[in-house]
Design a protein with these regions (language model features):
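Short, surface-exposed loop or secondary-structure junction motifs
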Residues: 72, 125-233
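Bacterial Sec-dependent signal peptides at the C-terminal "C-region" and cleavage site
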Residues: 17-28
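Short, conserved catalytic-motif segment at the N-terminal edge
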Residues: 28-87, 107-112, 167-168
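Short, glycine/proline-biased beta-turn/loop segments that scaffold the active-site neighborhood
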Residues: 110-124, 211-213
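Bacterial N-terminal signal peptides
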Residues: 9-18
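Bacterial N-terminal signal peptides that target proteins for export
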Residues: 1-10
Length: 233
């Protein structure tokens, strides 16, 4: 599933070029749909992506909503326009937006030290801000880079256990010195959303983004509940 973002990037670039004639009426709808099918198939083959769902909208007109390939390879379940996919690290966009929403409400400050929200976090001599969590300049080691995490990844670790896992690691660099992608930083940012809002991360996203924007098929991923039309892989 790690190829999904690459496939999406290829498609966005290709579709932008394909839709340009549509604005002037140069291509008829049938030819346009055939071209989109061709682009999707080529991108899936190039990235070895088993399944994908595509929606194309142009100036308010829904041109296409369609699934390609398989949502479940083992059981040969086809992907449709209703297939629900895990979005992985795209979740960080929602986390950052949630933090910024709380900044607008005066409940969070980007330049505030993280110890304001996590008093027991071992920052040592460093000063780490909320903003540095969001822009990957905190220097906190990413837990996905740690063998110890993968050894326990199937366990239902508590927030305290997760923080203990990566907070014990040496800093990768002095905070603010450079950029380095860190899932740990965004783990803390997600917890900050809960602390500042007084709601669970899932509740805050539902109330702030999903429901107001009509994102009826967007969910927070729990291991227990059944999600209709969820892709497997």
């Amino acid at each position: 599933m790690h190829n999904t973002s690459t496939t999406g990037s290829l498609l966005l670039a290709a579709l932008a070029t394909t839709l340009a004639p549509a604005a002037t009426g140069a291509d008829d709808r049938g030819a346009l749909l055939e071209r989109i099918d061709e682009l999707v198939s080529d991108s899936m083959e190039a990235t070895q992506t088993p399944g994908i769902s595509v929606a194309v909208q142009h100036r308010g007109d829904l041109i296409l909503a369609k699934g390609y390939g398989l949502a479940d390879v083992e059981n040969r379940v086809p992907a449709t326009e209703h297939t629900v996919y895990r979005i992985g690290s795209v979740t960080k966009q929602f986390t950052a937006a949630a933090v910024m929403k709380l900044v607008e409400e005066g409940k969070v400050a980007l330049d505030a030290p993280i110890t304001e929200y996590f008093p027991d976090y071992p920052v040592g001599e460093f000063h780490i801000t909320v903003g540095q969590l969001l822009d990957h300049t905190s220097g906190i080691k990413g837990y996905t880079e740690m063998p110890a995490f993968w050894e326990q990844s199937r366990l239902d670790l508590s927030h305290e256990q997760m923080i203990e896992l990566f907070s014990a690691e040496p800093y990768e660099f002095e905070p603010g010195d450079r950029y380095q992608y860190s899932n740990s930083g965004y783990y803390l940012a997600g917890l900050l959303v809960e602390k500042a809002s007084g709601k669970s991360y899932a509740e805050y996203l539902e109330e702030t983004f999903f429901r107001p924007l009509g994102m009826r098929e967007s969910h927070y991923l729990y291991s227990g509940p059944i999600v209709p039309n969820r892709a497997e892989g």
